[in-house]
């Protein structure tokens, strides 16, 4: 069908079709992504409410399903107040610098076999590079606000995000080593081959099992990277109020939270692609293969996002020194050690990947 649409479009519009088709595909990704963020916030409030033996949002619409729409309207109608002491240009650019990398990452994320905006061979490298740019927007927000609270929050964010990016990078390098490719689709396809996959038990052939420490480190580091609870000292309410966002209101404030929730979805999607077989079903059968691969990926991402929320509801906030100690003294040495083990494993006669 996609080939038919492409051929018809080229016949009608000629050279104008290619940029228009790229724009259409980008809109097809971004609009559902924004809806996912809206209802992820509702799911978070509902799930935490159930964990606390509360009802959660239930006033706007049936079962509270229109609550995200009401929240968006509220933020759109709020006055954007700009304190007199801020550096105006940098203050306005900072939220966009946080949001744009979070959206740009989706250009190379495959949703199913051959369903991707740009199927580049260096997709994994692109994700690692673009996702690390958002920290500059956080630093810029803290600096431009000319507030002590905002600056402290920005410095905490910079140190925390850089620290955990190292562990995440090492975890992804091990996936690169066993897959032998930087192409995200090739990494997913490589997980669905081998002894267990031939038996129809795909779930045991995925990377989560042989790379279990890396799987745990990558996901927990992702929680820290997104400044989510219990790693949310960047915006610890009892210490520095909203951290680098303290001087923002209205849509400026909303853009930071939009980027945070998009990054949560990115971490969950990358975890599913790198370690949980992507769009492949856990069991290879006629029934599971009848379900489109996109839905299997959505199910895995939804479960991982629910773990994000479960962690928030269950654990107290760590002290800043504990967060730094976990990153530098536990995760980085662990990932380096497992990287060496995997390298030896690949060169040994017991290599299970090739």
From Swiss-Prot:
The keyword Transmembrane applies. Its EC number is 7.1.1.-. It comes from Cupriavidus necator (strain ATCC 17699 / DSM 428 / KCTC 22496 / NCIMB 10442 / H16 / Stanier 337). Keywords: Cell inner membrane, Cell membrane, Membrane, NAD, Quinone, Translocase, Transmembrane, Transmembrane helix, Ubiquinone. Its main location: membrane. GO terms for cellular component: plasma membrane. It comes from the Bacteria. NDH-1 shuttles electrons from NADH, via FMN and iron-sulfur (Fe-S) centers, to quinones in the respiratory chain. The immediate electron acceptor for the enzyme in this species is believed to be ubiquinone. Couples the redox reaction to proton translocation (for every two electrons transferred, four hydrogen ions are translocated across the cytoplasmic membrane), and thus conserves the redox energy in a proton gradient. This subunit may bind ubiquinone. The chain crosses the membrane at residues 22-42, 91-111, 124-144, 168-188, 203-223, 255-275, 291-311, 326-346. One of its GO terms (biological process) is aerobic respiration. This is NADH-quinone oxidoreductase subunit H. InterPro entries: NADH_UbQ_OxRdtase_su1/FPO, NADH_UbQ_OxRdtase_su1_CS. It catalyses: a quinone + NADH + 5 H(+)(in) = a quinol + NAD(+) + 4 H(+)(out). GO terms for molecular function: NADH dehydrogenase activity; oxidoreductase activity, acting on NAD(P)H, quinone or similar compound as acceptor; quinone binding. It is a multi-pass membrane protein.
């Amino acid at each position: 069908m996609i080939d038919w649409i492409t051929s018809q479009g080229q016949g009608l519009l000629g050279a104008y079709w290619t940029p228009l088709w790229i724009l259409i595909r980008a809109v097809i990704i971004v609009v559902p992504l924004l809806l996912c963020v809206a209802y992820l916030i509702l799911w978070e409030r509902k799930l935490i409410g159930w964990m606390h033996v509360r009802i959660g949002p239930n006033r706007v619409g049936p079962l509270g399903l229109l609550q995200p729409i009401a929240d968006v309207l509220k933020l759109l109608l709020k006055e954007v107040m700009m304190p007199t002491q801020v550096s105006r240009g940098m203050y306005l650019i900072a939220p966009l610098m946080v949001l744009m990398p979070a959206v740009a990452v989706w250009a190379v994320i495959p949703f199913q076999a051959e369903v991707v905006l740009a199927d580049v061979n260096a997709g994994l490298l692109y994700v690692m590079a673009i996702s690390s740019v958002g920290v500059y927007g956080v630093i810029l927000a803290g600096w431009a606000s000319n507030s002590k609270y905002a600056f402290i929050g920005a410095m905490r964010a910079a140190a925390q995000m850089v620290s955990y990016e190292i562990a995440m990078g090492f975890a992804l390098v091990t996936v690169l080593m066993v897959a032998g490719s930087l192409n995200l689709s090739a990494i997913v396809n490589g997980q669905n081959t081998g002894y267990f996959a031939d038996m129809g038990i795909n779930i045991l052939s995925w990377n989560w099992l042989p790379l279990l420490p890396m799987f745990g480190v990558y996901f927990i580091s992702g929680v820290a990277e997104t400044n989510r609870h219990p790693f949310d000292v960047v915006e610890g309410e009892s210490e520095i109020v909203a951290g680098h966002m303290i001087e923002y209101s209205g849509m400026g404030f909303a853009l930071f939270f939009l980027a945070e929730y998009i990054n949560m979805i990115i971490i969950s999607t990358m975890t599913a692609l790198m370690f949980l077989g992507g769009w492949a079903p856990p069991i290879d059968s006629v029934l599971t293969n009848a379900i489109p691969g996109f839905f299997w990926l959505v199910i895995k991402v939804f479960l991982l996002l629910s773990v994000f929320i479960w962690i928030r509801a269950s654990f107290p906030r760590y002290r800043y020194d504990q967060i730094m100690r976990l990153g530098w003294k536990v995760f980085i040495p662990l990932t380096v050690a497992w990287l060496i083990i995997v390298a030896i494993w690949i060169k040994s006669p017991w290599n299970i990947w090739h």
